[in-house]
Amino acid sequence: MTTGADADLIERGRKLFAGDWQFIWASPSIETLPPMAGVEVAFAGRSNVGKSSLINALTGRGTLARTSRTPGRTQELIFFEGPKDADVRLVDMPGYGFASAPKARIASWTSLIHKFLLGRASLARVYVLIDSRHGIKDIDQAILTTLDRSAVSYQIVLTKADEVKATEMAERTEATRTLLAKHPAAFPDVLVTSSRTGYGVPELRAAMARLIGEHQR
Ligand SMILES: Nc1nc2c(ncn2[C@@H]2O[C@H](COP(=O)(O)OP(=O)(O)OP(=O)(O)O)[C@@H](O)[C@H]2O)c(=O)[nH]1
Ligand SMILES: [Mg+2]
């Protein structure tokens, strides 16, 4: 499947992520964020949806972001910086909806997530990851509502496509599109990915190459 990205963009995306990516900063709170710089792209989503794994798949570096089978792995806003000439950062976010953590911690993560999404001018795009097996839940809607209020452009990425049959995937994608009609600030189109197989990863890289191109103009 192609998601509309042409060969030139796919190549630009490939080059962007073939460059050197490294960890630069971890913020446990809104007060400790790095100074705003360049183009920032954040990955949000429920705990365990595959945010950190997708960052690893994009950068081709299997251990850049810490992943875990247990929800609640990423507990801070983690910043990764791309090649110097690109001036781009990826932000791995803590997951939301992690029910078995202490209440105070859930509240503090949730507040950090919403504050970051509302108040970060250098944030150029947020990818909201949704598990292909589950689709959009109420807890995701809260994030979409926050994003509707912020000026940042955002897009839904269905993850773990390898876990779902093709027919079910098509239904889930369609249902997700239908739900998005209620969120005019969202990209109407939905990306489908698997960090395990690499499905959809070149298209996501291409989308980011396009975004950076738009910001450098
Ligand atoms: N089958 C399959 N499993 C995946 C995929 N991506 C991630 N996983 C698994 O899902 C689990 C969670 O992955 P993470 O990348 O740590 O998820 P996260 O969203 O960063 O989780 P938190 O940091 O806890 O919010 C791990 O066991 C991964 O191996 C995928 O594309 N396919
Ligand atoms: Mg994580």
Swiss-Prot record:
Keywords: Cell cycle, Cell division, GTP-binding, Magnesium, Metal-binding, Nucleotide-binding, Septation. GO terms for biological process: division septum assembly. Gene3D superfamilies: P-loop containing nucleotide triphosphate hydrolases. It comes from the Bacteria. Its cofactor is Mg(2+). The keyword Nucleotide-binding applies. It holds the Pfam family MMR_HSR1. One of its GO terms (molecular function) is GTP binding. GO terms for cellular component: cytosol. CDD domains: YihA_EngB. GTP binds at residues 45-52, 72-76, 92-95, 159-162, 193-195. Residues 37-214 form the EngB-type G domain. Mg(2+) binds at residues 52, 74. HAMAP family: GTPase_EngB. Necessary for normal cell division and for the maintenance of normal septation. Belongs to the TRAFAC class TrmE-Era-EngA-EngB-Septin-like GTPase superfamily. EngB GTPase family. This is Probable GTP-binding protein EngB. It comes from Nitrobacter hamburgensis (strain DSM 10229 / NCIMB 13809 / X14).
